[in-house]
């Protein structure tokens, strides 16, 4: 998930938003979440959520729900989201 945080005036502001999103997604969906890029930029963040399942359909449902919840939490700050599969 690629985010643009125009309101962030410092890394502290950014960390506050990213931590809130990570905690929310972990709690609601039992997924692993990490900031994976743009760590030193105040107004950008790239966050990944990961789930493991023997059922690809179920994993897809979880990741769709994660994306929807992130969009609700972030609003227009969520620029894009993609799903990658490892077989």
List each model region and its residues.
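C-terminal structural segments of small proteins and small subunits
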Residues: 51-87
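A structural signal for short, well-ordered beta-strand segments
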Residues: 1-3, 47-49, 81-83
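Short beta-strand elements
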Residues: 29-36, 77-83
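Short, charge-patterned binding micro-sites
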Residues: 34-55, 86-87
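Residue-identity detector for glutamine
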Residues: 9, 39, 43, 61-64
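N-terminal first-folded block
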Residues: 1-28, 32, 69
């Amino acid at each position: 998930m690629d985010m643009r945080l125009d309101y962030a005036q410092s890394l502290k502001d950014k960390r506050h938003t990213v931590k809130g999103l990570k905690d929310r997604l972990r709690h609601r969906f039992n997924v692993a979440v990490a900031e994976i890029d743009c760590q030193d930029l105040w107004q950008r963040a790239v966050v990944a959520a990961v789930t493991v399942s023997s059922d690809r359909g179920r994993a897809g449902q979880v990741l769709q729900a994660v994306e929807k919840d992130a969009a609700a939490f972030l609003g227009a700050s969520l620029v894009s989201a993609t799903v990658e599969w490892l077989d």
